[in-house]
Protein backbone atom coordinates (compact mmCIF):
# COMPACT_ATOMS: atom_id res chain seq x y z
CA UNK A 1 0.00 0.00 0.00
CA UNK A 2 2.79 2.43 0.88
CA UNK A 3 4.51 1.81 -2.45
CA UNK A 4 1.27 2.36 -4.35
CA UNK A 5 0.65 5.60 -2.48
CA UNK A 6 4.23 6.72 -3.09
CA UNK A 7 3.74 6.18 -6.83
CA UNK A 8 0.52 8.19 -6.82
CA UNK A 9 2.24 11.06 -4.98
CA UNK A 10 5.20 10.99 -7.36
CA UNK A 11 2.89 11.01 -10.40
CA UNK A 12 1.19 14.15 -9.13
CA UNK A 13 4.49 15.88 -8.35
CA UNK A 14 5.96 14.93 -11.73
CA UNK A 15 2.94 16.21 -13.64
CA UNK A 16 2.76 19.62 -11.93
CA UNK A 17 5.04 22.63 -11.95
CA UNK A 18 3.13 25.01 -9.70
CA UNK A 19 1.89 24.85 -6.15
CA UNK A 20 -0.26 27.05 -3.96
CA UNK A 21 1.50 27.78 -0.67
CA UNK A 22 -0.32 29.15 2.37
CA UNK A 23 1.49 30.89 5.22
CA UNK A 24 0.31 32.51 8.43
CA UNK A 25 1.56 34.62 11.32
CA UNK A 26 -0.58 35.72 14.24
CA UNK A 27 -3.84 35.18 12.40
CA UNK A 28 -2.61 36.98 9.27
CA UNK A 29 -2.88 34.41 6.48
CA UNK A 30 -1.40 34.62 3.00
CA UNK A 31 -1.41 32.50 -0.11
CA UNK A 32 0.65 32.50 -3.29
CA UNK A 33 1.09 30.41 -6.41
CA UNK A 34 4.73 29.56 -7.14
CA UNK A 35 6.70 27.37 -9.53
CA UNK A 36 8.38 24.48 -7.75
CA UNK A 37 10.83 21.66 -8.39
CA UNK A 38 11.18 18.30 -6.67
CA UNK A 39 14.24 17.35 -4.69
CA UNK A 40 13.23 13.90 -3.53
CA UNK A 41 10.18 14.50 -1.35
CA UNK A 42 11.20 18.11 -0.73
CA UNK A 43 9.81 21.00 -2.77
CA UNK A 44 12.15 23.81 -3.83
CA UNK A 45 11.09 27.25 -5.09
CA UNK A 46 12.49 30.71 -5.80
CA UNK A 47 11.04 33.99 -4.58
CA UNK A 48 11.86 37.52 -3.46
CA UNK A 49 12.75 37.75 0.22
CA UNK A 50 10.70 40.91 0.97
CA UNK A 51 7.48 39.25 -0.23
CA UNK A 52 4.67 38.53 2.18
CA UNK A 53 5.07 34.74 1.99
CA UNK A 54 8.84 34.86 2.53
CA UNK A 55 8.53 37.22 5.50
CA UNK A 56 5.88 35.00 7.09
CA UNK A 57 7.94 31.85 6.48
CA UNK A 58 10.88 33.50 8.22
CA UNK A 59 8.75 33.98 11.33
CA UNK A 60 6.63 30.82 11.12
CA UNK A 61 8.05 27.99 8.97
CA UNK A 62 4.87 25.90 9.10
CA UNK A 63 3.14 26.00 5.71
CA UNK A 64 0.31 24.31 3.82
CA UNK A 65 0.78 23.44 0.14
CA UNK A 66 -1.78 22.39 -2.47
CA UNK A 67 -0.69 20.81 -5.77
CA UNK A 68 -3.00 19.81 -8.63
CA UNK A 69 -1.76 18.34 -11.93
CA UNK A 70 -2.65 20.35 -15.02
CA UNK A 71 -6.23 19.65 -16.04
CA UNK A 72 -7.02 17.83 -12.79
CA UNK A 73 -7.73 20.82 -10.57
CA UNK A 74 -10.06 19.77 -7.80
CA UNK A 75 -10.10 16.07 -8.83
CA UNK A 76 -6.67 14.60 -8.12
CA UNK A 77 -3.97 16.34 -6.15
CA UNK A 78 -1.92 16.72 -2.99
CA UNK A 79 -2.45 18.66 0.21
CA UNK A 80 0.83 18.96 2.09
CA UNK A 81 1.64 20.18 5.58
CA UNK A 82 5.30 20.92 6.12
CA UNK A 83 8.04 23.20 7.31
CA UNK A 84 9.67 25.68 4.97
CA UNK A 85 13.11 27.22 5.33
CA UNK A 86 15.25 29.59 3.35
CA UNK A 87 18.24 27.81 1.81
CA UNK A 88 21.48 29.29 3.14
CA UNK A 89 24.16 26.75 2.19
CA UNK A 90 25.94 27.89 -0.99
CA UNK A 91 26.10 24.41 -2.52
CA UNK A 92 22.39 23.93 -1.85
CA UNK A 93 21.68 27.30 -3.47
CA UNK A 94 23.47 26.19 -6.64
CA UNK A 95 21.47 22.98 -6.65
CA UNK A 96 18.22 24.90 -6.12
CA UNK A 97 19.15 27.24 -8.97
CA UNK A 98 19.47 24.30 -11.37
CA UNK A 99 16.29 22.67 -10.12
CA UNK A 100 14.21 25.82 -10.53
CA UNK A 101 15.59 26.46 -14.03
CA UNK A 102 14.54 22.93 -14.99
CA UNK A 103 10.97 23.97 -14.19
CA UNK A 104 10.90 27.55 -15.50
CA UNK A 105 13.25 30.21 -16.86
CA UNK A 106 10.79 33.00 -16.08
CA UNK A 107 12.88 34.29 -13.17
CA UNK A 108 16.36 33.61 -14.51
CA UNK A 109 17.10 37.33 -14.92
CA UNK A 110 16.47 37.91 -11.21
CA UNK A 111 18.16 34.69 -10.11
CA UNK A 112 21.40 35.84 -11.75
CA UNK A 113 21.23 39.53 -10.81
CA UNK A 114 24.36 40.33 -8.78
CA UNK A 115 22.77 43.36 -7.10
CA UNK A 116 19.73 41.39 -5.92
CA UNK A 117 21.92 38.51 -4.72
CA UNK A 118 24.38 40.78 -2.90
CA UNK A 119 21.58 42.62 -1.09
CA UNK A 120 19.71 39.41 -0.23
CA UNK A 121 16.61 40.45 -2.16
CA UNK A 122 16.13 37.02 -3.76
CA UNK A 123 16.36 33.54 -2.32
CA UNK A 124 15.56 29.84 -2.59
CA UNK A 125 13.28 27.99 -0.20
CA UNK A 126 12.78 24.33 0.67
CA UNK A 127 9.52 22.79 1.86
CA UNK A 128 10.03 19.60 3.88
CA UNK A 129 6.68 17.76 4.04
CA UNK A 130 5.54 16.34 7.36
CA UNK A 131 2.18 15.07 6.11
CA UNK A 132 1.10 14.46 2.51
CA UNK A 133 -2.59 13.89 1.78
CA UNK A 134 -3.34 12.36 -1.60
CA UNK A 135 -6.78 13.36 -2.92
CA UNK A 136 -8.62 11.64 -5.80
CA UNK A 137 -12.38 11.93 -6.01
CA UNK A 138 -12.54 9.24 -8.73
CA UNK A 139 -11.17 6.56 -6.42
CA UNK A 140 -13.08 4.63 -3.81
CA UNK A 141 -10.63 5.73 -1.13
CA UNK A 142 -10.67 9.44 -1.88
CA UNK A 143 -8.19 10.52 0.83
CA UNK A 144 -4.90 8.81 1.70
CA UNK A 145 -2.21 10.05 4.07
CA UNK A 146 1.53 9.70 4.30
CA UNK A 147 3.46 11.06 7.25
CA UNK A 148 7.17 11.87 7.37
CA UNK A 149 8.00 12.22 11.09
CA UNK A 150 11.68 12.88 10.43
CA UNK A 151 10.85 16.23 8.85
CA UNK A 152 8.89 17.47 11.84
CA UNK A 153 10.58 19.68 14.41
CA UNK A 154 9.83 18.70 18.01
CA UNK A 155 7.14 20.74 19.72
CA UNK A 156 9.56 22.05 22.36
CA UNK A 157 12.19 23.08 19.82
CA UNK A 158 9.57 24.69 17.57
CA UNK A 159 8.10 26.60 20.52
CA UNK A 160 11.56 27.88 21.45
CA UNK A 161 12.34 28.95 17.87
CA UNK A 162 8.97 30.65 17.44
CA UNK A 163 9.44 32.42 20.78
CA UNK A 164 12.76 33.86 19.67
CA UNK A 165 11.28 34.91 16.35
CA UNK A 166 8.35 36.54 18.14
CA UNK A 167 10.82 38.60 20.16
CA UNK A 168 12.52 39.53 16.89
CA UNK A 169 9.16 40.57 15.46
CA UNK A 170 8.49 42.94 18.34
CA UNK A 171 11.97 44.40 18.05
CA UNK A 172 11.27 44.98 14.37
CA UNK A 173 7.85 46.49 15.08
CA UNK A 174 9.24 49.00 17.56
CA UNK A 175 12.27 49.56 15.26
CA UNK A 176 14.66 48.89 18.13
CA UNK A 177 17.89 49.71 16.22
CA UNK A 178 16.66 53.28 15.81
CA UNK A 179 16.26 53.86 19.56
CA UNK A 180 19.69 55.50 19.42
CA UNK A 181 17.70 58.56 18.34
CA UNK A 182 16.40 58.61 21.93
CA UNK A 183 19.56 57.56 23.70
CA UNK A 184 21.60 60.48 22.36
CA UNK A 185 19.41 63.34 23.70
CA UNK A 186 18.84 61.60 27.03
CA UNK A 187 22.57 61.00 27.48
CA UNK A 188 23.30 64.64 26.66
CA UNK A 189 20.63 65.88 29.07
CA UNK A 190 22.04 63.54 31.72
CA UNK A 191 25.61 64.71 31.07
CA UNK A 192 24.65 68.37 31.49
CA UNK A 193 22.67 67.48 34.63
CA UNK A 194 25.61 65.60 36.14
CA UNK A 195 27.89 68.53 35.43
CA UNK A 196 25.45 70.89 37.17
CA UNK A 197 25.17 68.61 40.19
CA UNK A 198 28.95 68.38 40.42
CA UNK A 199 29.36 72.16 40.12
CA UNK A 200 26.88 72.62 42.95
CA UNK A 201 28.76 70.18 45.16
CA UNK A 202 25.91 67.67 45.37
CA UNK A 203 27.04 65.03 42.89
CA UNK A 204 26.10 62.38 45.43
CA UNK A 205 22.44 63.26 44.75
CA UNK A 206 22.63 61.79 41.27
CA UNK A 207 19.84 59.19 40.88
CA UNK A 208 20.33 56.22 38.60
CA UNK A 209 16.72 55.26 39.23
CA UNK A 210 15.47 58.55 37.82
CA UNK A 211 17.91 58.30 34.89
CA UNK A 212 16.64 54.86 33.87
CA UNK A 213 13.03 55.96 34.23
CA UNK A 214 13.68 58.97 31.99
CA UNK A 215 15.42 56.79 29.40
CA UNK A 216 12.64 54.20 29.53
CA UNK A 217 9.87 56.76 29.21
CA UNK A 218 11.59 58.49 26.30
CA UNK A 219 12.21 55.17 24.55
CA UNK A 220 8.54 54.24 24.87
CA UNK A 221 7.66 57.61 23.35
CA UNK A 222 9.77 56.78 20.31
CA UNK A 223 8.20 53.33 20.07
CA UNK A 224 4.78 55.00 20.09
CA UNK A 225 5.90 57.39 17.37
CA UNK A 226 7.25 54.58 15.19
CA UNK A 227 4.20 52.35 15.63
CA UNK A 228 1.66 55.12 15.05
CA UNK A 229 3.63 56.20 11.98
CA UNK A 230 3.39 52.63 10.64
CA UNK A 231 -0.35 52.53 11.29
CA UNK A 232 -1.24 55.86 9.72
CA UNK A 233 1.13 55.46 6.76
CA UNK A 234 -0.74 52.20 6.16
CA UNK A 235 -4.16 53.86 6.27
CA UNK A 236 -2.97 56.56 3.85
CA UNK A 237 -1.45 53.91 1.52
CA UNK A 238 1.95 55.65 1.70
CA UNK A 239 3.71 52.43 2.72
CA UNK A 240 1.50 50.23 0.53
CA UNK A 241 2.58 51.88 -2.73
CA UNK A 242 6.22 52.21 -1.67
CA UNK A 243 8.07 49.63 -3.76
CA UNK A 244 11.59 50.54 -2.62
CA UNK A 245 11.27 50.04 1.14
CA UNK A 246 14.39 49.25 3.15
CA UNK A 247 15.34 49.04 6.84
CA UNK A 248 15.67 52.85 6.76
CA UNK A 249 12.56 53.91 4.86
CA UNK A 250 9.05 52.70 4.18
CA UNK A 251 8.28 51.82 7.80
CA UNK A 252 8.79 48.51 9.57
CA UNK A 253 6.62 46.74 6.92
CA UNK A 254 5.10 44.42 9.53
CA UNK A 255 1.62 45.35 8.31
CA UNK A 256 2.44 45.13 4.61
CA UNK A 257 3.99 41.65 4.86
CA UNK A 258 1.30 40.26 7.15
CA UNK A 259 3.31 39.87 10.33
CA UNK A 260 0.96 42.04 12.39
CA UNK A 261 -2.50 43.46 11.82
CA UNK A 262 -3.02 47.24 11.69
CA UNK A 263 -4.95 46.94 14.95
CA UNK A 264 -2.03 45.23 16.68
CA UNK A 265 0.34 47.98 15.55
CA UNK A 266 -2.06 50.67 16.76
CA UNK A 267 -2.38 48.93 20.13
CA UNK A 268 1.43 48.85 20.34
CA UNK A 269 1.46 52.62 19.85
CA UNK A 270 -1.26 53.26 22.42
CA UNK A 271 0.24 50.94 25.06
CA UNK A 272 3.65 52.55 24.55
CA UNK A 273 2.32 56.07 24.89
CA UNK A 274 0.38 54.97 27.99
CA UNK A 275 3.67 53.70 29.44
CA UNK A 276 5.33 57.01 28.64
CA UNK A 277 2.51 58.94 30.31
CA UNK A 278 2.63 56.69 33.37
CA UNK A 279 6.38 57.12 33.80
CA UNK A 280 6.10 60.85 33.18
CA UNK A 281 3.42 61.30 35.83
CA UNK A 282 5.48 59.27 38.31
CA UNK A 283 8.53 61.44 37.64
CA UNK A 284 6.38 64.53 38.04
CA UNK A 285 5.14 63.27 41.39
CA UNK A 286 8.69 62.55 42.54
CA UNK A 287 9.86 66.05 41.63
CA UNK A 288 6.81 68.16 42.51
CA UNK A 289 4.94 65.99 45.01
CA UNK A 290 1.90 65.89 42.71
CA UNK A 291 1.20 63.69 39.71
CA UNK A 292 -0.28 66.65 37.84
CA UNK A 293 1.94 69.35 39.32
CA UNK A 294 2.50 72.33 37.02
CA UNK A 295 6.10 71.59 36.03
CA UNK A 296 8.17 71.46 32.83
CA UNK A 297 7.90 67.67 33.11
CA UNK A 298 4.13 67.86 32.67
CA UNK A 299 4.29 70.29 29.77
CA UNK A 300 7.12 68.57 27.91
CA UNK A 301 5.16 65.35 28.37
CA UNK A 302 2.01 66.86 26.90
CA UNK A 303 3.89 68.35 23.96
CA UNK A 304 5.85 65.14 23.42
CA UNK A 305 2.68 63.02 23.41
CA UNK A 306 1.07 65.39 20.90
CA UNK A 307 4.11 65.19 18.62
CA UNK A 308 4.37 61.39 18.93
CA UNK A 309 0.75 60.67 17.99
CA UNK A 310 0.28 63.70 15.73
CA UNK A 311 3.34 63.05 13.57
CA UNK A 312 1.27 61.08 11.06
CA UNK A 313 -1.91 60.51 13.08
CA UNK A 314 -5.32 61.89 12.15
CA UNK A 315 -6.47 64.59 12.25
CA UNK A 316 -3.22 66.47 12.90
CA UNK A 317 -0.85 64.62 10.52
CA UNK A 318 2.13 66.91 11.01
CA UNK A 319 4.30 64.83 8.69
CA UNK A 320 1.82 65.28 5.84
CA UNK A 321 1.67 69.06 6.23
CA UNK A 322 5.36 69.92 6.29
CA UNK A 323 5.71 70.03 10.07
CA UNK A 324 7.07 66.52 10.56
CA UNK A 325 10.72 67.54 10.40
CA UNK A 326 10.14 70.28 12.98
CA UNK A 327 8.27 67.83 15.21
CA UNK A 328 11.16 65.35 15.06
CA UNK A 329 13.75 68.04 15.80
CA UNK A 330 11.77 69.36 18.78
CA UNK A 331 10.77 65.97 20.16
CA UNK A 332 14.21 64.37 19.94
CA UNK A 333 16.08 67.57 20.69
CA UNK A 334 15.03 70.20 23.25
CA UNK A 335 12.09 68.28 24.69
CA UNK A 336 14.09 65.16 25.56
CA UNK A 337 17.30 66.93 26.53
CA UNK A 338 15.59 69.55 28.69
CA UNK A 339 13.09 67.08 30.14
CA UNK A 340 15.89 64.74 31.23
CA UNK A 341 17.90 67.66 32.59
CA UNK A 342 14.98 69.00 34.65
CA UNK A 343 14.28 65.63 36.26
CA UNK A 344 17.90 64.86 37.06
CA UNK A 345 18.71 68.32 38.47
CA UNK A 346 15.73 68.33 40.83
CA UNK A 347 18.09 68.33 43.87
CA UNK A 348 19.31 71.76 42.68
CA UNK A 349 16.13 73.57 41.72
CA UNK A 350 13.66 71.74 44.02
CA UNK A 351 10.94 72.49 41.46
CA UNK A 352 11.61 76.25 41.59
CA UNK A 353 11.64 77.22 37.92
CA UNK A 354 13.89 80.22 38.45
CA UNK A 355 16.66 77.96 39.77
CA UNK A 356 16.61 75.65 36.75
CA UNK A 357 19.65 76.04 34.46
CA UNK A 358 17.57 75.47 31.32
CA UNK A 359 19.66 77.62 28.97
CA UNK A 360 22.64 75.27 29.00
CA UNK A 361 20.39 72.26 28.34
CA UNK A 362 18.67 74.08 25.48
CA UNK A 363 21.97 75.03 23.86
CA UNK A 364 23.27 71.47 24.20
CA UNK A 365 20.15 70.15 22.43
CA UNK A 366 20.57 72.17 19.22
CA UNK A 367 23.12 70.00 17.35
CA UNK A 368 21.41 66.74 18.22
CA UNK A 369 18.02 68.17 17.19
CA UNK A 370 19.33 69.05 13.74
CA UNK A 371 21.10 65.72 13.31
CA UNK A 372 18.09 63.60 14.27
CA UNK A 373 15.98 65.62 11.85
CA UNK A 374 18.52 64.84 9.12
CA UNK A 375 18.08 61.10 9.71
CA UNK A 376 14.43 61.48 8.77
CA UNK A 377 15.32 63.93 5.99
CA UNK A 378 17.70 61.60 4.13
CA UNK A 379 15.42 58.58 4.69
CA UNK A 380 12.67 60.48 2.86
CA UNK A 381 14.65 60.53 -0.39
CA UNK A 382 13.69 56.96 -1.29
CA UNK A 383 10.12 57.60 -0.09
CA UNK A 384 9.68 60.86 -2.03
CA UNK A 385 7.80 59.45 -5.07
CA UNK A 386 5.35 57.43 -2.94
CA UNK A 387 4.98 60.26 -0.40
CA UNK A 388 4.12 62.71 -3.19
CA UNK A 389 1.58 60.26 -4.62
CA UNK A 390 -0.45 60.18 -1.38
CA UNK A 391 -0.06 63.87 -0.50
CA UNK A 392 2.53 63.43 2.24
CA UNK A 393 4.21 66.79 1.77
CA UNK A 394 7.48 66.33 3.57
CA UNK A 395 10.10 69.00 2.99
CA UNK A 396 11.94 66.65 0.68
CA UNK A 397 8.78 66.46 -1.46
CA UNK A 398 8.16 70.22 -1.15
CA UNK A 399 11.66 71.25 -2.20
CA UNK A 400 12.11 68.64 -4.94
CA UNK A 401 11.33 69.42 -8.57
CA UNK A 402 8.82 66.96 -9.99
CA UNK A 403 8.92 67.09 -13.79
CA UNK A 404 7.90 63.51 -14.35
CA UNK A 405 10.81 62.38 -12.22
CA UNK A 406 11.54 63.53 -8.67
CA UNK A 407 14.59 65.83 -8.84
CA UNK A 408 16.27 65.86 -5.44
CA UNK A 409 19.15 68.33 -5.90
CA UNK A 410 17.54 70.97 -3.67
CA UNK A 411 16.71 68.57 -0.80
CA UNK A 412 20.29 67.28 -0.95
CA UNK A 413 21.66 70.82 -0.84
CA UNK A 414 19.52 71.55 2.23
CA UNK A 415 20.68 68.29 3.83
CA UNK A 416 24.27 69.46 3.49
CA UNK A 417 23.48 72.95 4.81
CA UNK A 418 21.74 71.59 7.89
CA UNK A 419 24.61 69.18 8.50
CA UNK A 420 27.14 72.02 8.39
CA UNK A 421 24.95 74.08 10.74
CA UNK A 422 24.79 71.18 13.20
CA UNK A 423 28.57 71.02 13.47
CA UNK A 424 28.85 74.80 13.64
CA UNK A 425 26.51 74.55 16.63
CA UNK A 426 28.82 71.92 18.18
CA UNK A 427 31.80 74.24 17.68
CA UNK A 428 29.81 77.13 19.17
CA UNK A 429 29.13 75.07 22.31
CA UNK A 430 32.86 74.43 22.59
CA UNK A 431 33.63 78.15 22.21
CA UNK A 432 30.97 79.05 24.77
CA UNK A 433 32.66 76.66 27.16
CA UNK A 434 35.90 78.61 26.84
CA UNK A 435 34.34 81.92 27.90
CA UNK A 436 31.03 81.19 29.67
CA UNK A 437 29.25 78.57 31.75
CA UNK A 438 26.81 77.77 28.93
CA UNK A 439 29.02 75.34 27.05
CA UNK A 440 31.92 72.97 27.45
CA UNK A 441 35.28 72.69 25.73
CA UNK A 442 34.75 68.93 25.64
CA UNK A 443 32.20 69.55 22.88
CA UNK A 444 35.09 70.01 20.42
CA UNK A 445 35.61 66.24 20.58
CA UNK A 446 32.16 65.84 19.01
CA UNK A 447 33.58 67.36 15.81
CA UNK A 448 35.39 64.10 15.06
CA UNK A 449 32.49 62.69 12.98
CA UNK A 450 33.15 65.47 10.44
CA UNK A 451 35.25 62.90 8.58
CA UNK A 452 32.16 60.74 8.20
CA UNK A 453 30.19 63.80 7.09
CA UNK A 454 32.62 64.39 4.24
CA UNK A 455 32.27 60.76 3.18
CA UNK A 456 28.47 60.95 3.33
CA UNK A 457 28.44 64.09 1.16
CA UNK A 458 30.67 62.40 -1.41
CA UNK A 459 28.50 59.27 -1.57
CA UNK A 460 25.33 61.38 -1.81
CA UNK A 461 26.71 63.35 -4.76
CA UNK A 462 27.64 60.14 -6.56
CA UNK A 463 24.20 58.73 -5.88
CA UNK A 464 22.49 61.86 -7.23
CA UNK A 465 24.20 61.35 -10.60
CA UNK A 466 22.79 57.83 -10.77
CA UNK A 467 19.34 58.96 -9.60
CA UNK A 468 19.10 61.51 -12.42
CA UNK A 469 20.34 59.11 -15.09
CA UNK A 470 17.30 58.33 -17.30
CA UNK A 471 18.78 54.92 -18.13
CA UNK A 472 19.23 53.93 -14.48
CA UNK A 473 17.34 50.99 -12.99
CA UNK A 474 14.71 52.78 -10.91
CA UNK A 475 14.22 49.71 -8.73
CA UNK A 476 17.89 49.48 -7.77
CA UNK A 477 19.11 53.09 -7.50
CA UNK A 478 17.11 53.89 -4.31
CA UNK A 479 18.93 51.09 -2.48
CA UNK A 480 22.31 52.56 -3.40
CA UNK A 481 21.59 55.48 -1.06
CA UNK A 482 21.55 53.15 1.95
CA UNK A 483 25.18 53.89 2.80
CA UNK A 484 24.26 57.56 3.17
CA UNK A 485 21.26 56.61 5.34
CA UNK A 486 23.53 54.54 7.57
CA UNK A 487 26.19 57.26 7.69
CA UNK A 488 23.65 59.86 8.81
CA UNK A 489 22.54 57.63 11.68
CA UNK A 490 26.19 57.05 12.56
CA UNK A 491 26.93 60.79 12.55
CA UNK A 492 24.02 61.42 14.92
CA UNK A 493 25.02 58.55 17.20
CA UNK A 494 28.70 59.46 17.34
CA UNK A 495 28.12 63.16 17.84
CA UNK A 496 25.56 62.60 20.58
CA UNK A 497 27.00 59.60 22.39
CA UNK A 498 30.72 59.99 21.92
CA UNK A 499 30.84 63.64 22.81
CA UNK A 500 33.75 63.66 25.26
CA UNK A 501 31.72 65.77 27.64
CA UNK A 502 29.19 62.95 27.94
CA UNK A 503 31.87 60.31 28.29
CA UNK A 504 33.77 62.40 30.82
CA UNK A 505 30.69 63.03 32.91
CA UNK A 506 29.51 59.44 32.89
CA UNK A 507 33.03 58.22 33.60
CA UNK A 508 33.27 60.50 36.64
CA UNK A 509 29.89 59.29 37.85
CA UNK A 510 30.86 55.66 37.33
CA UNK A 511 34.12 56.26 39.23
CA UNK A 512 32.24 57.83 42.10
CA UNK A 513 29.79 54.90 42.19
CA UNK A 514 32.71 52.46 42.12
CA UNK A 515 34.41 54.30 44.98
CA UNK A 516 31.24 54.18 47.08
CA UNK A 517 30.93 50.46 46.40
CA UNK A 518 34.60 49.89 47.30
CA UNK A 519 34.27 51.87 50.55
CA UNK A 520 31.16 49.90 51.44
CA UNK A 521 32.86 46.55 50.79
CA UNK A 522 35.90 47.56 52.83
CA UNK A 523 33.73 48.54 55.74
Regions flagged by a language model, labelled:
Residues 2-4, 76-159:
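Charged, gly/pro-rich active-site loop segments
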Residues 16-49, 55-57, 63-69, 76-80:
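Short beta-strand segments
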Residues 159-213, 217, 221, 225, ...:
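Topogenic membrane-insertion module of multi-pass membrane proteins
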Residues 186, 200-228, 296-309, 354-378:
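Membrane-embedded alpha-helical segments that form the functional core of polytopic membrane enzymes
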Residues 220-246, 373-396:
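Acidic (Asp/Glu-rich) catalytic motifs at the cytosolic membrane interface
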Residues 243-289, 392-439, 479-489:
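Multi-pass membrane catalytic core of lipid/isoprenoid biosynthesis enzymes
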Residues 251-350:
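Intramembrane alpha-helical segments
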Residues 435-523:
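Extended hydrophobic alpha-helices typical of membrane-associated regions
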Amino acid sequence: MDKVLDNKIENVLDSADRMFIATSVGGNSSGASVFFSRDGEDLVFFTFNPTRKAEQIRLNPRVHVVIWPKGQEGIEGLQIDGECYKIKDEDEKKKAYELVLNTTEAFQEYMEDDFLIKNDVVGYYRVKPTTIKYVNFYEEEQFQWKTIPGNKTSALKMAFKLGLKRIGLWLRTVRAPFLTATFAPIFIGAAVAWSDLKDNGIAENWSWKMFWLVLGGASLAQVATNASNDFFDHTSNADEINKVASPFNGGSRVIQVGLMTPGQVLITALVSIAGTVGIGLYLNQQVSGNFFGNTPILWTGIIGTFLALGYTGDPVRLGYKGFGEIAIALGFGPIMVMGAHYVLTAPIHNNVLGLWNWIEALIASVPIAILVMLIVWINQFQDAPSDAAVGKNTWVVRTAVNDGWMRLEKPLSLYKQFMVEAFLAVAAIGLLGMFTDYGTVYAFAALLPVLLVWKAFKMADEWMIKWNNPDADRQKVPYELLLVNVSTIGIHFLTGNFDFCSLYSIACLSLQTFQKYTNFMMG
